[in-house]
Amino acid sequence: MPYRLKLPEAEVLGVGKFKNSQGHTECAEFIRQATNAPSTPVWKKGRKVSEANLGDILRGTAIATFDDADRYPTDALGRHAAIYLSHTSGGISVLDQWNAQGEVKPRLIQFNKPKGTSRSNDGSTFFVIE
């Protein structure tokens, strides 16, 4: 079962709205608070966004990167989670946050980035969270 945004999109935008207990604006914390998803070790790898037909993934669905063991990564190759808005052949439109950014904002994550690009910045590495 995919996790979906529980708030209107306009209400998630802004500085510091989704902080963890240490005051950090991590991507996974945004997903947990905005969708009621469990903690990352429980996340399951669903449909690959880049292989989905337009309309197969509903706007507001939680997506994330997963490693070769089908888990949310803990290695140095990058990890990220976001809210899916839409996608084209070029990339995924998302709402996301991370510590350095400090707020939820829309962003385009392109597909098929060069080898060595962090998973966080390659749309080809994102899957629906189940």
What do the PLM-derived regions correspond to, one by one?
Residues 1-77:
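Secreted/periplasmic proteins that engage bacterial cell-wall peptidoglycan
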Residues 3-17, 85-130:
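Aromatic- and glycine-rich peptidoglycan recognition patches
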Residues 30, 63, 81-84, 94:
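Generic hydrophobic secondary-structure signal
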Residues 59, 80, 103-107:
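Secondary-structure boundary/capping motif
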Residues 74-87:
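Short beta-strand-centered aromatic/proline hotspots
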